[in-house]
Amino acid sequence: MKHILHVVLALSALSAGQRLWAQATGKTETIYSFQAPPGATYPAAGPIISKSGVIYGTTNSGGTTTGCGFFNCGTVYELTPTVPPSGALTETTLYSFTGFAGGAQPNNRLVFGASGTLYGWANGGAFGQGVVYELTPPASSGGAWTETEVYSFQGPPSDGGLPVGGLAIGKNGSLYGATYFGGKYDQGTVFELTPPASVGGVWTLTVLYSFHGDGDGIYPGAGVIVAANGVIYGTTTQGGALGVGTVFGLKLVAGAWKEEVLSSLTGGVSNPNGLAFGPDGVLYGQTPGDNIFEAMPPAAAGGAWTVQSLYNGFGLSGWGYIDQPSIAVGPAGAIYWTTTFGGTSTACGVSLGCGALNELVPPTSPGGSWTQLVLHNFTGQAGDGYQPNGGLVVTKNGDVIGTTYYGGQDFFGTVFRYTP
């Protein structure tokens, strides 16, 4: 199903009374408003963008299949710029989820595989523990995408249960991720899905690590990220020395995966739910309480990682509460993220605030301070979205693109773009 919608609104990025260290400039605009089923409705995760500028994502409602709630079982969507460019996007529903046994209501970001293939996971599956799927583009223009079930999680003790966050893809085409439950101790896992050796073969799941809580982290709250050297990094929401979470690494040593707690977190940085790569091996992360932190690798082999809070905005005007991991790093080293609640506007009818798009600008000299900016306070009014959630994309020219769960022209959510 296709819809064409023109850019509906250009919005001011600022409003009076924000607590800022510097004046933000730029423009935030709604570039697409989702519509009622059978189209895609309520995007619960951020988008990804192809080299040609096509936007892909998931919604946990909408589509053609009923029986999963009031607004159907969810979709994978595609938003294609018109040719020649006119500011319009054409929506195509690539796949409508079929129900809980076949997967339903996805709430995580997609990841690109080879030749434009898309991977993600959805709730449900054969055992009700989540299912990883593959979407293969058509062989010729105008054809249909093909959905294939990659793996249905079985839960403990066989493997993980309830994947969290998005998947990551390695150089070998393997998919990596984390589950909140499951594994040998039912406290979460990190897993690898290895593609088949030949067409038509079966993917193989390997539990790389089962969290156990003995000084270790437990219950990962987000997916993992994979470095160029193959090291896997992630976070747990609980466990560690103080019980408030960890930053961990997994490295292949002599043919076996070895887990290392890089940092046991403290009350100042607790219950993390996502990481992103920064420059020179630095990791940036976030917590549900709107804390942005930095994990610095040791200067010398055998040294300790250092974690420090870059910003703690919980409870401050213009900032708020993070629902899903959204952190992204721009080409100039700035950190971007959204808060689902908070901000200065309650015009959407949410007393906790309609959400905000935020930026941390790195210091210009070593030892300097990061500069905090609110780029946009969502309002839910006049086509604006509200309650942003899920990941952001920062383009090469510095635009920031994300989604809101609600709002827009028809109140079924939006795709927004911030232009510096």
Please state what every model-predicted region is.
Residues 2-420:
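Extracellular beta-propeller repeat domains
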